[in-house]
């Protein structure tokens, strides 16, 4: 019936005639558009993050293997073709100085620069710059043209290189074509096919900044200073031309994007060695709508400029105008020489933006015009550039770079590599022949496997020893979960490999029950040490996961279901020298609904944090549901809390959580003593049966989650529940095993 209805609608469209005429008027059907449930009930828990990026949206199909395609690519030939594009100016968007290199550097930088360490979101992976909102952010103005310039390359190579990889590679090639030696390039970034659901800030208009509280304290997880900017306002905080105030914004923003002071100075000084800013006239008078709001006839282009030619020397982008150096398409130290060699005074660009030029007209004929060889200009600086001169810490670094060009070159090369690869995860995800020879600490390296892996008989023997160790099922499950569930699919960090749960800072996180964790790890280390005395060896990272698996098999057995939890050895144990404590501190789960933990200082509600954590773990709605219910039955709450343990048989892998949650003989009410806690009362006697939190009750309250919970609460679901739990559990344990995927 549904297909027949679609066919009828299609026929009606055919007989009603061409739709072009209607498109020239007001958009038809606006009053008939569906209004989402979120509109009617804005407080309703939004499950959309768990439904994004499904395989159904990928036109390349479920079986497409990007890594295999990329490995067949002739990367050197591709790079030469990119260089040809770079030096072939197009009439529809002429190249500054006859070279698109600086333009492509900005494209690559802005593709990667959205990354933020707090939640790992943003970054170059997925090629999200192609989609809204990033495609239409003010800070990305005219980058639609940069990608369109690359379309002939993408068209030729098709599925062999993703847009995500192509944008970063093009940035590298741009640097190399202008005389700079890059630190390397890794492919492996797959393309997304829809816009990512990311919280970019509370603002409702571009360039607003309601993201601050108190004394300009930027709220987590945000990093940029204003809605629609990648980093900071180049004119200074909210347009205030104060270099020292700008330095504070720079340090905060770049720090939240994983860069220290030295990397920050290197990136700004290195990046502004190339190219120019564009602001030949007032954008409010001459620049049209961004791509998302432009007309169909623009075919994805935005920011149409009606000032004179509309491009070339009349281009309007940021509103700032000019170049920093006399050789904007060559790698030099001129940026630093100019920064410290001139005294800078405030002026305004032709568009009215605040910028800086040398005092008393110095350097007036230093910089060639980007399009008219008969014209010369003075160099310019942004307020944010002068921050490198006036901030004490930045100044020391910038002067050192000026005096030591080779050190500056290496620092920029490494910072650029970090910027463009920060969200790629471990080295096992890197593809290509141009990789750095030595691992970098921000890549969270782990040792290579240097021992023979355990086989089936040894695995069974180890499981027996674990179950006889005196450690309980909940203890083993909690420890394995704590080790693996630190993983973030957003930037592929964390996970069980490396056994960093035994190292600082992870061993001290409150959610991990440090006292209990220490005892469990000590016992497992004893088992490991004894086993490793002869024959094959096992890492602690592997043993932690195996211990959790053994506990689940035992718990399922007690429930009357025989099951074998998959186990793939090959993890190794990282050292403290391979672990950046500060870098790992951002992985700390401030809330973990699967362990019924909700720490202080969270900006989202417990149920929102449930969805966020499930999204980080790449879980579907059914996987999230069965995992939480199973963890409750296994008595795996943090701190041994009994909230949500809706079973009289804790430690048994049963579907009791769902059965008792949906039991109509229980009436739920808010606790009068504890905020956020609920009590389940016997409807007849009023006696208290259970206590639970919002992340427990949401599976009975939310209509879509209840529908899934009903499946697992059914009488015929006992075996399905166990098998689905095991499948989801194994998925979490294997999230960081890119070496076997």
UniProtKB/Swiss-Prot annotation:
PROSITE patterns per record: PEROXIDASE_1, PEROXIDASE_2, PEROXIDASE_4
Cross-link position per record: Tryptophyl-tyrosyl-methioninium (Tyr-Met) (with W-109): 231-257
Textual note on the cofactor: Binds 1 heme b (iron(II)-protoporphyrin IX) group per dimer.
Keyword Iron (UniProt): yes
UniProt KW keywords: Heme, Hydrogen peroxide, Iron, Metal-binding, Oxidoreductase, Peroxidase, Signal
Record-listed cross-link Tryptophyl-tyrosyl-methioninium (Trp-Tyr) (with M-257), residues: 109-231
Protein modification: Formation of the three residue Trp-Tyr-Met cross-link is important for the catalase, but not the peroxidase activity of the enzyme.
Cross-referenced InterPro entries: Catalase_peroxidase, Haem_peroxidase, Haem_peroxidase_sf, Peroxidases_AS, Peroxidases_heam-ligand_BS
Required cofactor names: heme b
Enzyme Commission number(s): 1.11.1.21
GO biological process: cellular response to hydrogen peroxide; hydrogen peroxide catabolic process
A Gene Ontology molecular function term of the record: metal ion binding
Marked site (Transition state stabilizer) residue numbers: 106
Entry annotation: catalytic residues: 110
GO CC annotation: cytosol
Reaction(s) catalysed (UniProt annotation): H2O2 + AH2 = A + 2 H2O; 2 H2O2 = O2 + 2 H2O
Role noted for this protein: Bifunctional enzyme with both catalase and broad-spectrum peroxidase activity.
Quaternary structure note: Homodimer or homotetramer.
Family according to the record: Belongs to the peroxidase family. Peroxidase/catalase subfamily.
Protein's UniProt name: Catalase-peroxidase
């Amino acid at each position: 019936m549904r297909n027949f209805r679609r066919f009828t609608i299609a026929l009606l469209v055919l007989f009603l005639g061409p739709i072009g005429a209607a498109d020239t008027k007001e958009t038809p059907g606006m009053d008939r558009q569906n209004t989402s449930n979120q509109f009617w009930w804005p407080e309703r828990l939004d499950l959309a993050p768990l439904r994004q990026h499904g395989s159904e949206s990928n036109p390349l199909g479920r079986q497409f293997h990007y890594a295999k395609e990329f490995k067949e690519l002739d990367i050197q030939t591709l790079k030469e073709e990119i260089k040809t594009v770079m030096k072939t100016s197009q009439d529809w968007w002429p190249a500054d100085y006859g070279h698109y290199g600086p333009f492509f550097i900005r494209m690559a930088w802005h593709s990667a620069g959205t990354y933020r360490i707090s939640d790992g979101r943003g970054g170059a992976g997925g090629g999200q710059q192609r989609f809204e909102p990033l495609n239409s952010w003010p800070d990305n103005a005219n980058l639609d043209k940069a990608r369109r310039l690359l379309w002939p390359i993408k068209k030729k190579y098709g599925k062999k290189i993703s847009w995500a990889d192509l944008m970063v590679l093009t940035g590298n090639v741009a640097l190399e074509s202008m005389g700079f030696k890059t630190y390397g390039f890794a492919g492996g970034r797959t393309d997304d096919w829809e816009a990512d659901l990311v919280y970019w800030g509370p603002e409702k208009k571009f360039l607003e900044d309601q993201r601050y509280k108190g004394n300009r304290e930027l709220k987590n997880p945000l990093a940029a200073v204003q809605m629609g900017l990648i980093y900071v306002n180049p004119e200074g905080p909210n347009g205030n031309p104060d270099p020292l105030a700008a330095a504070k914004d720079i340090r905060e923003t770049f720090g939240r994007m994983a860069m220290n002071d030295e990397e920050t100075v290197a990136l700004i000084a290195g990046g502004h060695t190339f190219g120019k800013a564009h602001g030949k006239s007032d954008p409010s008078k001459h620049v049209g709508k961004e791509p998302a709001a432009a007309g169909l006839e623009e075919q994805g282009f935005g920011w149409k400029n009606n000032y004179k030619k509309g491009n070339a020397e009349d281009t309007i982008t940021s509103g700032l105008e000019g170049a920093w150096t006399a050789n904007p398409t060559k790698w030099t130290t001129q940026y630093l020489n100019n920064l410290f060699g001139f005294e800078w005074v405030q002026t305004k660009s032709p568009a009215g933006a605040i910028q800086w030029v040398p005092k008393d007209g110095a350097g007036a004929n230093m910089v060639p015009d980007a399009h008219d060889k008969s014209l010369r200009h003075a160099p310019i600086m942004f307020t944010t550039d002068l921050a490198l001169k006036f901030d004490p810490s930045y100044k020391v670094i910038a002067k050192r770079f000026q005096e030591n060009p080779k050190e500056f070159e290496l620092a920029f090369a490494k910072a650029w590599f970090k910027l463009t690869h920060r969200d790629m995860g471990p080295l096992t995800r890197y593809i290509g022949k141009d990789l750095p020879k030595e691992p970098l600490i921000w890549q969270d390296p782990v040792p290579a496997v240097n021992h023979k892996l355990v086989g089936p008989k040894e695995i069974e023997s180890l499981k027996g020893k674990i179950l006889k160790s005196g450690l309980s099922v909940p203890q083993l499950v909690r420890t394995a979960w704590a080790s693996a569930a630190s993983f973030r699919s957003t930037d592929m960090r964390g996970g069980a490999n490396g056994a960093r749960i035994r190292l600082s800072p992870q061993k001290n996180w409150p959610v991990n029950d440090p006292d209990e964790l220490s005892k469990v790890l000590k016992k497992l280390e004893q088992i490991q040490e004894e086993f490793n005395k002869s024959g094959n060896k096992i890492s602690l990272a592997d043993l932690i996961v195996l211990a959790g698996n053994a506990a689940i098999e035992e718990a399922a057995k007690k429930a009357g279901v025989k099951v074998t939890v998959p186990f793939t050895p090959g993890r190794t144990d990282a050292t403290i020298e391979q672990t950046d404590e500060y870098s790992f501190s951002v992985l700390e789960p401030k809330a973990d609904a699967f362990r019924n933990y909700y720490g202080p200082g969270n900006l989202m509600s417990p149920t929102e944090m449930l969805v966020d954590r499930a999204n980080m773990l790449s879980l579907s709605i059914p996987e999230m549901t069965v995992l939480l219910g199973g963890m409750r039955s296994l008595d795996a709450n943090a701190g041994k809390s009994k909230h949500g343990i809706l079973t009289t048989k804790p430690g048994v892998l049963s579907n009791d959580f769902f059965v008792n949650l949906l039991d109509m003989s229980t009436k739920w009410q808010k606790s009068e003593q504890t905020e956020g806690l609920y009590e389940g009362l016997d409807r007849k006697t009023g006696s208290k049966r259970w206590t639970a939190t919002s992340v427990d009750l949401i599976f009975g309250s939310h209509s879509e989650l209840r529908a899934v919970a009903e499946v697992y609460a059914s009488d015929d679901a006992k075996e399905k529940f166990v098998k689905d739990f095991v499948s989801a559990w194994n998925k979490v344990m294997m999230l960081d095993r890119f070496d076997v995927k």
